[in-house]
Regions:
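FNR-like FAD-binding dehydrogenase module
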Residues: 1-403
Length: 403
């Protein structure tokens, strides 16, 4: 999913049947719950935070951590164990002619196929392992040809453009053994979301900001596994397994240190946490937020909160870029270049820079803008400006949480 990190934590799935059981005695300084023993958190709030007419369905979701003993700091992430769409599982079992109550062994535990495909295995994205398995069962010449060494590029494209359901539907086979089918699947992995809250402001809660991944493939609407679950099926009071993933490389400096925060879309989530924390602590350090989205009217995430922080000076400055509101697309890096002199002055004062969001576009564009700003204001060569920015990274004054 977009706006998420993925973890290879099969152990979360292993813990699902006993999620509500506490672990044995632990050292005093360790939480009771972890990624191997996730806490079952109830959903306190799940609301859309975009306006009517938005092309997105960005949501603010609040989880209760009450009784968990879990703690986090701004910059950390929440690992969430989502489940597959029941409609996809039902269609897959129908195509396979496998009974939903057929029982299989999964790491020593007896599960029905419905349980296993819903909670334990990835049934959306096709992998090379699944393609290998299905090709062995199928008589389809097209699949056999894709396995040839000189077709590696085509095979990669095929896997990117075909889900497991697409392959099963397009290349039907005879009888499928339930135990054999799951050997071609990978474990369902939890997803990581930047925490959008501070315990200093909302004790025993963790908030996240999620934009569900939605797209069309082969004429059918598709959704991301976790983001689709959270947006479409996670109702109030529902419970999901969660854990805290610490992020020591993306955290606030001292209270008096200036901070520059740059994010687009859901990448603004940790900066909400930063400002909640600074407000609660009465921090005096200056703060500057650059925020980008598509439309001012519909997509200004957490608008009233930023305005309140500007009013009480928890947030010193804010620049916004709404890319689809004008004749030309304007992004956060363009706003940065409009504030070249002030940005460089903040850097010279010791400001820390934080970037959160898309790794493919936002991160490199902001990085290039920083180098251009330093080169222009310091009247230095591009190489010298790059050295300056590299020094910021080495001093942990330029931190990125990108995905």
């Amino acid at each position: 999913d977009a706006s998420v990190h993925q973890l290879s934590v099969a152990a979360v799935s292993d813990a699902l049947p006993a999620m509500s059981a506490r672990a044995g005695p632990l050292a005093v300084d360790l939480p009771v719950y972890s990624k191997r023993n996730p806490f079952v958190a109830s959903i306190l709030e799940n609301i859309a935070i975009v306006g009517r007419g938005s092309t997105k369905d960005t949501r603010h979701i609040e989880f209760s951590l009450s009784g968990s003993g879990l703690t986090y700091t701004p910059g950390d992430a929440l690992g969430i164990g989502a489940s597959n769409d029941p409609a996809i599982v039902a269609e897959l079992l129908s195509l396979l002619s496998v009974a939903r109550d057929a029982v299989i062994d999964v790491k020593g535990q007896a599960l029905t196929m419905d349980e296993a495909l819903t909670h334990r295995f990835e049934v959306t994205a096709a992998t090379p392992r699944f393609l290998d398995y299905w090709t062995l069962l199928s008589d389809a010449a097209e699949l056999k040809q894709l396995q040839q060494d000189d077709r590696a590029g085509e095979r990669t494209i095929f896997l990117k453009t075909h889900h497991i359901l697409d392959i099963v539907r397009r290349y039907p086979v005879g009888a499928v053994l339930p135990t054999g089918f799951v050997t071609g699947l990978r474990p369902l992995q939890p997803r990581l979301y930047s925490i959008a809250s501070s315990l200093a402001a909302v004790p025993d809660e963790a908030h996240v900001t999620i934009a569900p991944v939605r797209y069309a493939l082969h004429g059918k609407s598709r959704s991301g596994v976790a983001s689709g679950h959270l947006a479409d099926r996670a109702e109030l009071d529902a419970s999901l397994p969660v854990y805290i993933q610490t992020n020591p490389h993306f955290g606030l400096p001292g209270d008096d240190v200036p901070i520059i925060m740059i994010g687009a879309g859901t990448g603004v989530a940790p900066f909400r946490a930063f400002l909640q924390e600074r407000e609660a602590r009465g921090a005096k350090g200056k703060s500057w937020l650059f925020f980008g989205e598509r439309h001012f009217r519909t997509d200004f995430l957490y608008q009233t909160e930023w305005q309140a922080w500007l009013k009480d000076e928890t947030l010193s400055r804010m620049d916004v870029a709404f890319s689809r509101d004008g004749a030309e697309k304007i992004y956060v890096q363009h706003r940065m270049k409009e504030r070249t002199r002030d940005l460089f002055a903040w850097l010279e004062e010791g400001a820390h820079v934080y970037v959160c969001g898309d790794a493919a576009q936002l991160a490199p564009d902001v990085h290039a803008a920083l180098i251009d700003i330093v080169a222009a204001e310091a009247r230095s060569s591009p190489d010298a400006a790059e050295d300056y920015v590299r020094a910021l990274q080495a001093d942990h004054r330029y931190q990125r949480d990108v995905y």
